[in-house]
Amino acid sequence: MPSLDELTISTIRGLSVDAVSAANSGHPGAPLGLAPAAHVVWQKMKFNPKDPNWINRDRFVLSNGHACALLYSLLVLYKFELTVDDLKQFRQLGFKTPGHPEATDTAGVEVTTGPLGQGISNAVGIAIAQKQFAATYNKPDITLSDSYVYTFVGDGCLMEGVSSETSSLAGHLQLNNLIAFWDDNRISIDGDTAVSFTENVPDRYRAYGWNVLEVPDANTNIEAIAAAVDEAKKSTDKPTLIRLVTTIGYGSLKQGSHDVHGSPLKPDDIKQLKKSWGFKEDVDFFIPEEVSEYLAKHVSENQKVQKEWEAKLAEYKKKYPTEGAEIQRRLDGKLPEGWKEYLPKYTPADKPLATRKLSENVINALHGKIPEFIGGSADLTGSNLTRAEGSVDFQPPSTGLGNYDGVYIRYGVREHGMGAIMNGIAAFGANYKNYGGTFLNFVSYAAGALRLSALSHHPVIWVATHDSIGLGEDGPTHQPIETLAHFRAIPNLSVWRPADGNEVSAAYAAAIESTSHPSVIALTRQNLPQLEGSSIENALKGGYTLVKKDNPDVIIVSSGSEVSISVAASEELAKQGVKANVVSLPDFFTFDQQSDEYRLSVLPDGVPILSVEVMSTFGWSKYSHEQFGLNRFGASGKAADLYKYFEFTPEGIAERAQKTIKYYEGKQLLSPLDRAF
């Protein structure tokens, strides 16, 4: 007679195999190998299926997201929102069991994973957020935050560069609340890992500053797995990597081979597995009653733990009313009342400044006003201007470099890691509004994480400075050309390119208020004038008419540093007897959400429209009839010389505006916005 633990593990394996079989698609190998570890970890975790967002829950992150049949089986067994019927519809359209875990679809899924290496990196971000939240609000007599984050990672996750970036930082930051389980099954899609992955992973992680524990028989030895978890939780100054030596597809006729990784098992294989577990061979999605009762007991215990925590929170609010009210506000997802009053406002009389400097002004203005507004830079603090005056770094207290309640994170030269960590910080909850700085061109290093930000609805903020050839002498290796076109093509991503101080404040206002999409704020190195006609209110529409003439002959639509040049071009055209409106379009995403009536009032029928932006013209045809941009790489030189060389001058723009007018003269012209669908 198998023990309850053995029966539960077999049930997890059975549900996972049946889900993949029902879909005729998926990955049965990892769930078969990892089921024992999953059972042990979930029995040690504190969580409440009826309140899956409880802030002090332990988090489980499946970095090897292809093994999601395992996670879905656990969510069914512990009675989250998922049901057996959802499992039966694994990987089918319209159900909560997609082919890789999606946090927006499925309660109990902490982060969206699939691209390998992202999950462990998100877990580092969750651990950072927990540390920061705990250090900010825990008191000597009341501990409100003491949760752990557990993550399962495969060989592929550890091959990806992003996991190296974030694991290195996790070791430096001494994140002892992070426990990672490496599924060392020695198999990749190409076959045995001997063909490509032969480094000493435990030694690598020790060098990062991690504890490393090993379970050599993780297919069956749940006592050893449990002991390893207990040992990991004793750590006071290191994250822990637990090496689980497993067999992929354990028990299958094809165990230990890459054939069992990403294809359903054959019917005869499934039958022999079920027979070995003592299950009926012809019964699918079998859940023994005693397993349900066993797991329900753990849930009941956890619900008591949450009630005790809620009583502790109530006591905390009485003893520490200011902090208690702040915690409740954050848990409610609300920002501090009146925070937008601190946003800087500008007039044309104010001196020209680089928009990166104007961004710094916003960060300084909001420092201390929004406690959950935290951020950092990928080793470019002095260039990105992302550190508020008087802020404390997020660092282990033992280093003497800061404290865990610090609000500024030194990410090092780890752009991709920074992006994935930012996603984890957002996923933690507590209304974190976190930002990361680098050069715009190097946000491309983090494209994988940025795409997942948008897919996951994480309202993270990228402070992306040095946004064009205007950065000058560093040359085309650093000058973005295709970057904004790429980012604007990502669904659910707001890409701001503000033209002056009011537009910078608007970009931050929108980004901080967002609860469902990330933002990239592209900022200049060079100084720009404060514009007549700009305002936070106007910019919050994503696009607006900055220079308005009656019955214009042409409209020049632009963004960022080219807006002021376009205004000068309008003045040049006026000398030539041409009336030119100038439209500032700092964010396509926000502008597209405005009413048709408003958008057509800005970019109307009957007037030729010329777009001007000193980078790729790709995407501008949606808003203009003709496009003036830079569809080649830049060059090294002084910014002013580059703008002149590429003809991004008032005269160069005016010349192209005249050509646009001439080309469309006498032609019936609809707005580019005027479309069938």
Curated annotation (Swiss-Prot):
<feature type="binding site">
    <location>
        <position position="525"/>
    </location>
    <ligand>
        <name>substrate</name>
    </ligand>
</feature>
<feature type="binding site">
    <location>
        <position position="415"/>
    </location>
    <ligand>
        <name>thiamine diphosphate</name>
    </ligand>
</feature>
<dbReference type="InterPro" id="IPR029061">
    <property type="entry name" value="THDP-binding"/>
</dbReference>
<dbReference type="InterPro" id="IPR033247">
    <property type="entry name" value="Transketolase_fam"/>
</dbReference>
<dbReference type="InterPro" id="IPR055152">
    <property type="entry name" value="Transketolase-like_C_2"/>
</dbReference>
<dbReference type="GO" id="GO:0005634">
    <property type="term" value="C:nucleus"/>
</dbReference>
<comment type="subunit">
    <text>Homodimer.</text>
</comment>
<feature type="active site" description="Proton donor">
    <location>
        <position position="415"/>
    </location>
</feature>
<feature type="site" description="Important for catalytic activity">
    <location>
        <position position="27"/>
    </location>
</feature>
<feature type="site" description="Important for catalytic activity">
    <location>
        <position position="261"/>
    </location>
</feature>
<dbReference type="InterPro" id="IPR020826">
    <property type="entry name" value="Transketolase_BS"/>
</dbReference>
<feature type="binding site">
    <location>
        <position position="156"/>
    </location>
    <ligand>
        <name>thiamine diphosphate</name>
    </ligand>
</feature>
<dbReference type="GO" id="GO:0046872">
    <property type="term" value="F:metal ion binding"/>
</dbReference>
<keyword id="KW-0106">Calcium</keyword>
<dbReference type="InterPro" id="IPR049557">
    <property type="entry name" value="Transketolase_CS"/>
</dbReference>
<dbReference type="Pfam" id="PF02779">
    <property type="entry name" value="Transket_pyr"/>
</dbReference>
<dbReference type="Pfam" id="PF00456">
    <property type="entry name" value="Transketolase_N"/>
</dbReference>
<dbReference type="InterPro" id="IPR005475">
    <property type="entry name" value="Transketolase-like_Pyr-bd"/>
</dbReference>
<comment type="function">
    <text>Catalyzes the transfer of a two-carbon ketol group from a ketose donor to an aldose acceptor, via a covalent intermediate with the cofactor thiamine pyrophosphate.</text>
</comment>
<feature type="binding site">
    <location>
        <position position="185"/>
    </location>
    <ligand>
        <name>Mg(2+)</name>
    </ligand>
</feature>
<feature type="binding site">
    <location>
        <position position="66"/>
    </location>
    <ligand>
        <name>thiamine diphosphate</name>
    </ligand>
</feature>
<keyword id="KW-0808">Transferase</keyword>
<dbReference type="Pfam" id="PF22613">
    <property type="entry name" value="Transketolase_C_1"/>
</dbReference>
<protein>
    <recommendedName>
        <fullName>Transketolase 1</fullName>
        <ecNumber>2.2.1.1</ecNumber>
    </recommendedName>
</protein>
<feature type="binding site">
    <location>
        <position position="155"/>
    </location>
    <ligand>
        <name>Mg(2+)</name>
    </ligand>
</feature>
<dbReference type="InterPro" id="IPR005474">
    <property type="entry name" value="Transketolase_N"/>
</dbReference>
<dbReference type="InterPro" id="IPR009014">
    <property type="entry name" value="Transketo_C/PFOR_II"/>
</dbReference>
<feature type="binding site">
    <location>
        <position position="466"/>
    </location>
    <ligand>
        <name>substrate</name>
    </ligand>
</feature>
<keyword id="KW-0460">Magnesium</keyword>
<feature type="binding site">
    <location>
        <position position="474"/>
    </location>
    <ligand>
        <name>substrate</name>
    </ligand>
</feature>
<feature type="binding site">
    <location>
        <position position="356"/>
    </location>
    <ligand>
        <name>substrate</name>
    </ligand>
</feature>
<keyword id="KW-0786">Thiamine pyrophosphate</keyword>
<dbReference type="GO" id="GO:0005829">
    <property type="term" value="C:cytosol"/>
</dbReference>
<feature type="binding site">
    <location>
        <begin position="114"/>
        <end position="116"/>
    </location>
    <ligand>
        <name>thiamine diphosphate</name>
    </ligand>
</feature>
<keyword id="KW-0479">Metal-binding</keyword>
<feature type="binding site">
    <location>
        <position position="27"/>
    </location>
    <ligand>
        <name>substrate</name>
    </ligand>
</feature>
<comment type="similarity">
    <text>Belongs to the transketolase family.</text>
</comment>
<feature type="binding site">
    <location>
        <position position="185"/>
    </location>
    <ligand>
        <name>thiamine diphosphate</name>
    </ligand>
</feature>
<feature type="binding site">
    <location>
        <position position="442"/>
    </location>
    <ligand>
        <name>thiamine diphosphate</name>
    </ligand>
</feature>
<dbReference type="InterPro" id="IPR005478">
    <property type="entry name" value="Transketolase_bac-like"/>
</dbReference>
<feature type="binding site">
    <location>
        <position position="261"/>
    </location>
    <ligand>
        <name>thiamine diphosphate</name>
    </ligand>
</feature>
<feature type="binding site">
    <location>
        <position position="383"/>
    </location>
    <ligand>
        <name>substrate</name>
    </ligand>
</feature>
